[in-house]
Regions:
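Loop/turn elements at helix/coil->beta-strand transitions in domains of secreted/extracellular proteins
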Residues: 64-66, 94, 121-124, 310-315, ...
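Membrane/wall-proximal cationic-aromatic binding patches
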Residues: 30-94, 111-112
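Short loop/turn segments at strand-loop or loop-helix junctions that form parts
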Residues: 71-72, 127-132, 272-279, 318-323, ...
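Membrane-embedded segments
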Residues: 74-165
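C-terminal regions of proteins
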Residues: 99-101, 335-336, 342-422
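Hydrophobic membrane-insertion alpha-helices, especially the h-region
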Residues: 6-27
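Extended hydrophobic/aromatic segments used for targeting, binding, or gating
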Residues: 88, 283, 293-299, 304-367
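Secreted/periplasmic serine-hydrolase-like ester/acetyl group-modifying domain
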Residues: 36, 156-300, 402-422
Length: 422
């Protein structure tokens, strides 16, 4: 009987064991290929966002300065003046590496950063904040889990310092992913308990395995080249060889005029047809009761800020606008929205994060927004006028003064006068 079982399951067991050996002993040395790194940087795929190997490969290339551009779905709004297109066409001394997906917010960005901490130390980043992240209801666990993997988990566990950031991150992770691996260790961190030597040994073993697995499987991307051609190369020929904002504005304006003809909200035709028009009546007054002032997202944002401060990263924050006509149609309160922007800015500026491009009041400008809440056309040019000098003439990070009060529930739910918060 045992012999028959071995004949059936033995080969499977041996094959599985050999795969584990292959992964564990797979070489993790990085070989650079600038073309492939550009493909990955502009692909804006789930893999390029959450896999370690693709990010590290680009960010450590000595022949090109890739800069993390962190956000969510705004990066997929490609046109002739998108940041990736302008950087490539005019051979900027940097290239954006886009890290974001629809549905991702600060918590996903925090765990993604854990994979690249040595590679962002004392460098620069661009971080786009959408006030729409700051909802009263926590975002769905499924949305978080879609962009989270075991390598992010063990990277966090190796990097954590047992401080308030570690406690908050562990607590949030247990809530967003209740069946997460190494749950017992996370529970210790969430309670502020010290880890044992055995805990650290387990973390180290899992971390090495996850790194090797990322090196082996994370390098494969069949979509990267096609996406780069679609997202970047196809637009290069439309731009003048000599850089000029006036010329670029004319191109962007003509493109916008030609592609916003089927609606009076200034939205791109395709987006309006497939995302708005079919449910137009449903959207009327839809955001009347929205409140961006009370949200756990403020605490999650503090996780990211603490990490930037620890890593001495000089960050440019960009605050997105809302399409003014869309705001009026859905009855989103502009007073509430601007109050939320004020709260976000206070959390940033009071701790030394003073590089802020605030476009929250530009939502009524023609061709500034491509759909409901995302930059496009003239918005991308305004973005470039701030981002390009920030990255072309890099300065060291300021001396940040972090305030743990921003991890409190008091702050997350505060909706009063910002100046009165103690």
């Amino acid at each position: 009987m045992l012999k028959r079982l071995w004949l059936i399951f033995g080969p499977i067991f041996i094959a599985g064991f050999l795969v584990l050996l292959l992964i564990f002993f797979y070489p993790s040395t990085t070989s650079h290929n600038l073309t492939e790194e550009k493909y990955s940087a502009a692909s804006i795929s789930r893999e390029s966002f959450k896999e370690r190997s693709q990010k590290v490969r680009a960010l450590t290339d000595p022949n090109m300065r890739f800069v993390p551009f962190l956000g969510s779905s705004e990066w997929i709004r490609f046109d002739s003046v998108h940041p990736a297109v302008l950087a490539e066409k005019y051979n900027r001394p940097y290239r954006p590496y886009f890290m974001g997906q629809a549905g991702a917010a600060s918590l996903n960005q925090y765990f993604g950063l854990q994979q690249i901490l040595p590679d962002i130390e004392e460098k620069h980043a661009v971080f786009v904040i959408s006030p729409q992240w700051f909802t009263e209801t926590d975002y769905e666990p499924a949305a978080f889990q879609r962009f989270f993997n075991s390598d992010q988990l063990t990277a966090f566990l190796e990097n954590q310092a047992g401080d308030i950031s570690a406690k908050h991150a562990a607590t949030r992770l247990l809530k967003q992913n209740p069946s997460v691996a190494l749950k017992g260790i996370l529970q210790k961190l969430s309670k502020g308990e010290d880890l044992s030597d055995a805990d650290r040994l387990i973390i180290n073993l899992f971390a090495r395995f996850n790194e090797k697995q990322s090196s082996l499987f994370g390098q494969f991307s069949v979509r990267g080249k096609l996406k780069y051609k679609e997202h970047v190369e196809n637009y290069l020929k439309d731009l003048p060889d000599q850089f000029s904002y006036d010329a670029l504005e004319e191109i962007a304006r003509k493109d916008a005029e030609a592609n916003t003809t089927n609606n009076d909200m200034g939205m791109e035709n395709h987006f309006y047809t497939y995302e708005v028009k079919k449910d137009l009546k449903k959207w009327e007054g839809y955001q009347k009761n929205y409140n961006f002032l009370k949200s756990s997202e403020y605490n999650d944002l503090q996780l990211v800020l603490n990490q930037f401060a620890k890593s001495k990263v000089n960050v440019l924050f960009v605050i997105q606008p809302v399409n003014k006509k869309w705001m009026e149609y859905t009855e989103l309160s502009e007073e509430m929205y601007q109050h939320a922007v004020e709260k976000i800015r206070y959390q940033l500026e009071s701790q030394g994060f003073t590089n802020i491009a605030d476009f929250s009041k530009n939502g009524g400008e023609p061709y500034f927004i491509k759909d409901t809440i995302h930059l496009g056309w003239l918005g991308w040019l305004a973005f470039d006028k701030v981002v390009n000098p920030f990255l072309t003439d890099p300065k060291p990070a300021p001396d940040y003064k972090m305030n743990d009060r921003f991890f409190s529930k008091d702050w997350a739910t505060y909706d009063g006068n910002i100046k009165d918060f103690q």
